[in-house]
């Protein structure tokens, strides 16, 4: 899972993808990481919420982990907290 900054984020979301906003100190974020690694249907990126505070404000991130799926540059679905693989795959139901 590639860690991206705010600049890379802007170009990454132009393709269908999943972005996880998380931190290094967050227990649920650490638990979620291996599950995110199993998603192969679309690119999965990680944004460090501590380093990219302005991006978190822009996207209304109030809790980590927050996982957002993007389709054609727009937010499609959002989940907060540790998730199962099946819940993550439900975020991708836009016909990939």
Annotated model-derived regions:
Residues 1-11:
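N-terminal "domain-start" segment that seeds a small globular fold
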Residues 2-4, 21, 33-55, 61:
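Thiol-based oxidoreductase modules, predominantly thioredoxin-like and allied folds used
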Residues 9-14, 33-42, 92:
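Alpha-helix C-terminal capping segments
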Residues 11, 58-59:
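Short amphipathic alpha-helix with an adjacent loop that forms part of the alpha/beta core around
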Residues 13-23:
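Short active-site neighborhood of thiol/selenol oxidoreductases, capturing the structured segment around
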Residues 26-29:
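Short cysteine clusters
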Residues 59-68:
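Structural micro-motif
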Residues 69-96:
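Non-catalytic, surface beta->alpha helical segment in thiol-disulfide oxidoreductase systems
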């Amino acid at each position: 899972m590639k860690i991206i900054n705010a600049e890379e984020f802007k170009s990454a979301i132009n393709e269908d993808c999943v972005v996880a906003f998380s931190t290094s100190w967050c227990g649920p974020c650490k638990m979620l990481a291996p599950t995110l690694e199993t998603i192969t249907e679309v690119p999965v990126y990680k944004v460090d919420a501590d380093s990219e505070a302005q991006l978190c404000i822009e996207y209304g991130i109030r809790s980590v982990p927050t996982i957002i799926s993007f389709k054609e540059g727009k937010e499609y679905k959002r989940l907060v907290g540790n998730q199962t693989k099946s819940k993550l795959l439900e975020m991708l139901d836009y016909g990939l």
